Amino acid sequence: EPAPGEAEEPEYDEHVWTSPRNAKLIVQKISDTLCEADAPGADAYKANTAAYLAQLDQLDAEFKAVVDGAARRTMVFGDRFPFRYLADAYGLDYFAAFPGCSTETEASAATVKFLIDKVSAEHIPVVFHIELSNEKMADTISEATGAKVLLLHACHNISRDDFLAGKGYLDLMTDNVEALREALN
């Protein structure tokens, strides 16, 4: 708690890449740095960067189209919430069991009740969990409301199966587009 007269610090979310728009900035900075460090390879880096940025533009357009055509703009997470940049980029509202990527492992009864009431009152069809989660909180909300439990992948951890299948950022974020489409309609 801040002392009277002190400003509360804003919630910090290090998951900047959950917004494809931010991912573009990251990719460009990496490319620029590689071009400086390896001038003979600069043409290849620039070509690969241009191709990847085009894919990120397409991903951004897909997210925008889903949100623009959505019946609602509210996401519910029975889990941590590493999607602040995604939510801000597309004007989405969210409610989560834990702030950001809190180290808390048990949500309060009041938080659980609030999320159940929110899902029920707004007829929200999906409750999200993040990758490598135990999904307990999302399952609890689902059992109380009938909402479906889906993964929204923050792209900072990857399962062994996804790794072996060669899945990368674009694949995981494309899966997120489809999960968001279901959640917002």
Which role fits each region the language model picked out?
Residues 1-185:
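Extracytoplasmic metal-acquisition and chelation regions
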